[in-house]
From Swiss-Prot:
Keyword presence, Amino-acid biosynthesis: yes
UniProt keyword terms in alphabetical order: Amino-acid biosynthesis, Branched-chain amino acid biosynthesis, Leucine biosynthesis, Lyase
Protein encoded by which gene: leuD
Reported function: Catalyzes the isomerization between 2-isopropylmalate and 3-isopropylmalate, via the formation of 2-isopropylmaleate.
Pathway involvement of the protein, from the record: Amino-acid biosynthesis; L-leucine biosynthesis; L-leucine from 3-methyl-2-oxobutanoate: step 2/4
Family label: Belongs to the LeuD family. LeuD type 1 subfamily.
A cellular component annotation (GO) from this entry: 3-isopropylmalate dehydratase complex
Reactions this protein catalyses: (2R,3S)-3-isopropylmalate = (2S)-2-isopropylmalate
Enzyme class: lyase
GO BP annotations, alphabetical order: L-leucine biosynthetic process
Protein name per UniProt: 3-isopropylmalate dehydratase small subunit
Amino acid sequence: MKAFTQHNGLVAPLDRANVDTDQIIPKQFLKSIKRTGFGPNLFDEWRYLDVGQPYQDNSKRPLNHDFVLNHERYQGASVLLARENFGCGSSREHAPWALEEYGFCAIIAPSYADIFFNNSFKNGLLPIILSEAEVDELFKQVEASPGYQLSIDLQAQTVTRPDGKVLSFEIDAFRKHCLLNGLDDIGLTLMDADAIASFESRHRASQPWLFRD
């Protein structure tokens, strides 16, 4: 997993509350066992005017030009600004996978659904919680200022606006450590590789009948 330390990026405003995981990545795209290939279908039902299908050539599909991510000014956005209860609905790691592959590395919202919140951290996506008042002000500034960017410092736990105002956010110390060091569940396990190998050796010696060579 790629480490997250600091990021300065263009902000895209998704001014909708209660965005669920089926809206983030619709169910028909969940058939793949790979964790790649979901970015092109992020928010598929909003980005396109037709019904998308797996392995379809999206370049030939009709775009919904009213949807924010199809606006020219938000192309290349890497910070998603959202409303409350983002990521509600069924559990699917495909949701943070799709957001990351599209190009987002952080989300800012007043609140998140618990499962999506946890899945985001495990997949290197930083979900930042700010107050509703702070988020409201960000929406106003983003829409009034083309090219609006935010600077995120995970170590300092701050989001800095273009006008210099610094917004602070809270984050669990363990999750912060994992993001700063690029540690997912596999990475954390590998840190104890020597201890695991030692246990397996002792276990094999004490109960050899459990093993087949």
